[in-house]
Amino acid sequence: MKRRVVITGLGIVSPVGNDLTTAWDNIVNGRSGISRITRFDPSAITTHIAGEVKDFDISTYISSKEARQMDTFIHYGLAAGMQAWRDCGLEVTEANAERIGVIVGSGIGGLPRIEETQVEYLSKGPRRISPFFVPGSLINLISGHLSIAYGMKGPSYAVVSACTTGLHCIGDAARLIEYGDADVMVAGGAESTVSPLGIGGFAAMRALSTRNDDPQTASRPWDRDRDGFVLGEGAGVLVLEEYEHAKKRGARIYGEFVGYGMSSDAHHITAPDKDGPRRGIVNALRNGGLNLEDIQYVNAHGTSTPLGDKNETDALKLAFGDHAKKLVVNSTKSMTGHLLGAAGGIEAVFTTLAVYNQVSPPTINIFNQDPECDLDYCANEARQMKIDVGLSNSFGFGGTNGSMAVRRV
């Protein structure tokens, strides 16, 4: 028999804020975190905008010496993980250490550090390569550092599945608890690819918005004039806990992780296919023993791409049938941009807060809704509403899909 899993801690680093209170306030009030890129000169690239993390100081979490040994994506993951752990109010002890684990992943990992090290190598030779280059770039090192920092001796690894990474990490962590391999898991995703290669690579694919003159309206899911996604960065991390374990210690419970579904399109490396996401959604509902009518809110993948937004709309209609018209569907990417491997992490945070606070954040920048995208997208204003169960979707290159459900407790 599966054990129940609840969410007892949340942490976030994002373009809309580097703590839970700030980020949620900005999301609910429809404030965009997208602006012109400041980290490097993007003028040679067609896209000049991104959702950068601002005013972030890693030295408030770890020493400057430690920080220099890590790429920025690890900084973000550590910070969000430490926030979530503090939020849950649990201490690691000799008695419980082996029952607490970490699964925090990244879609791409240490790209800026790889770029910088390549420049050093070409200009000054191999002797200038830092001995921390490899461990500072590895994707599983967020989990490793969190495990070491707190003495967590349970399962520790990372999932890598492009833009579904964060959700897959959370779903896998929940299953470890459900089937008895752990009692508590720290899980989510982190990413930092606002760099020449990161922006340049996606621009070469013509995947990014080029609305450079108006950054805050560039990410516009389901709008008729959407022209691509906006790259974002940051991290979102949850603490998942076995229900009786959390209840016994009097923990605050944000919601119950109640369903997890996965699927593959088996179609194309980048082009979407509506049947794959449909099956992922249906699998999540089946896993949670949920009926279609149990779901009121969907935090959609909603990237603001011409093909992707219509495809997700079609998948939702296929999965939910007539009930799709009753769903409130929201894309927080309209404010944060697309955080790639961290997207499922921060969107799990936002989905959990939507259920906990009984409010759907808005999808901003819907000026002219695409007639082919004909669901209720909570356009431009947040909405107080009853949410018994919220669903979050993530889809990634290679046709990998994930959906998770959070129930009000």
Regions found by a protein language model. Give the residues of each.
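Feature captures the FAD/FMN-dependent oxidoreductase FAD-binding
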Residues: I74-N96, G101-S106
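Condensing-enzyme catalytic core mediating Claisen C-C bond formation in acyl metabolism
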Residues: R4-T8, S35, D213-G288, Y297
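Conserved catalytic cysteine-centered active-site region
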Residues: M1-K2, R36-A79, W85, G109-D172, ...
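ACP-dependent fatty acid/polyketide chain-elongation machinery
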Residues: M1-E66, C88, E244-E256, V349-T363, ...
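Glycine-/small-residue-rich "gating" segment that lines the acyl/pantetheine channel
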Residues: S123-S130, G171, R175, Y179, ...
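Conserved small-residue
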Residues: G9, I27, G81, V102, ...
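Phosphate/pyrophosphate-binding loops at sites that engage ATP/ADP/AMP, CoA/4′-phosphopantetheine
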Residues: A84-N96, A246-G250, I281-Y297, A319-H323
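Short glycine/threonine-rich loop-to-helix capping motif typified by GTGT followed
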Residues: A266-P277, T303-F320, L339-I346
